[in-house]
Amino acid sequence: RQRQMCIRDRLKPDAVESLRQLNNSAHRCVMITGDNALTAIHIAEEVEIVAREALIFDKGAVGEELVWRRTDDSIVRMQDPDAPLHRHLFDEYDVCVTGAALRVIEERPEALRELVGNTVVYARVSPNQKELVLSVLRSLGYIALMAGDGTNDVGALKMANIGVALLDGSEEDLQRIQEHARLERLKKVYESQLSLMSRWGQPPPPVPPVLRDA
């Protein structure tokens, strides 16, 4: 006999009103998460980031093909990864992009910019993809504030104009953030050394072990 258990992580009482105030004051609110698309869309609907029918832009089952599908898995349109995006869909739906689809579109800068400019939810994205989304938003002229509550958000927090870290204050989280910042500083120093050696026609210095093993 099969058994099921349902667990719900309730929203904070002021979450909906806070997001509503941001949306009503000419701010654009976007969700970027590692959760799956259906979970992300459900939460985004609760906080009114998604107001229309949601459409998921995802990688198909074969090769590099992409699909535009509803939450019930019905296909709205197929998308040739090398063809222009179906722009009319942005006018009809609130779009959720998966990390798998983002990996395909990353190779096409103009399509990526158009997609990021019209997407309200990102699901199943990696830490590097979170950082990429923030980078593209800034290139589109947005002043970006990123709020994140885990070490997976550190890169995106640093990429944003304003990064708000929502931590539980545990020593482990703080140590990870400090270590990430230290590695970033070492990386910049090493890149400066590479540039200097190249300018003087000298061989590159060895990669510091701490960077090589990172």
Sequence positions of predicted segments:
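Cytosolic catalytic headpieces and adjacent flexible linkers of membrane translocases
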Residues: 1-4, 8-136, 154, 158-214
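Conserved Lys-Pro-Asp/Glu-containing loop-to-beta segment of HAD-superfamily phosphomonoesterases
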Residues: 133-150
